[in-house]
Amino acid sequence: MSSRPLAVLIGSPGAGKTTVGRALAERLGVDLLDTDAEIERRAGKTVSDIFVEDGEEAFRALEREVVAEALASHPGVVALGGGAILNEQTRADLAGHRVVYLEVEFADAAKRVGLDTARPLLLGNPRARLKALLRERLPIYQSLATLTVSTSEHTPEEAAELIAKELPAAGD
């Protein structure tokens, strides 16, 4: 079996990387490595707590380490955190991988990350921030993708099926 991922899923928060990743890994009979979950396991705290307690720089450094290891040696499906593609070295490391961009409409992403409910003012405007993130990152996601699948138009199972059909048969 290959020591590189069969597929690497990228996309914004709420795109369904973990959910589609689970469905795809199950369909292919391999493991899913969700880089955010691996970061939490290594740090012993949530991504949110890492950001608050240690800062974004510390989070991004740990994320870079986890992503580099996954891209070099995980033989299943890898789901990257939404911002992992901001790292130049990560973008370079993605070259030659089967990178699947999970595209999502803003309204669906907002709903999936819980921004469709009333929020206290002290949070600022998280919907505007999410919209800005989607707009800023879109060209990067598109430039890295070898395949794009809409998770607004397809269920996670349908998305996994579409991705699986595009992957080479085992041994190719």
Swiss-Prot record:
Catalytically driven reaction(s): shikimate + ATP = 3-phosphoshikimate + ADP + H(+)
This enzyme's EC code(s): 2.7.1.71
Kinase found in the keyword field: yes
One GO BP: amino acid biosynthetic process
Record key words, sorted: Amino-acid biosynthesis, Aromatic amino acid biosynthesis, ATP-binding, Cytoplasm, Kinase, Magnesium, Metal-binding, Nucleotide-binding, Transferase
Binding-site list for substrate: 36, 60, 82, 137
Binding site for ATP: 14-19, 119
GO molecular function, one term: shikimate kinase activity
Pathway membership, UniProt: Metabolic intermediate biosynthesis; chorismate biosynthesis; chorismate from D-erythrose 4-phosphate and phosphoenolpyruvate: step 5/7
Origin superkingdom: Bacteria
Enzyme class, UniProt record, top EC level: transferase
PROSITE patterns per record: SHIKIMATE_KINASE (PS01128)
GO cellular component, one term: cytosol
Cofactor(s), names only, from the UniProt record: Mg(2+)
Entry note: cofactor: Binds 1 Mg(2+) ion per subunit.
Localization annotation: Cytoplasm
Binding positions (Mg(2+)): 18
Cystine connections: none
HAMAP family tied to this protein: Shikimate_kinase
Annotated family: Belongs to the shikimate kinase family.
Oligomeric form and interacting partners: Monomer.
The protein's role, per its UniProt record: Catalyzes the specific phosphorylation of the 3-hydroxyl group of shikimic acid using ATP as a cosubstrate.
Name of the protein in question: Shikimate kinase
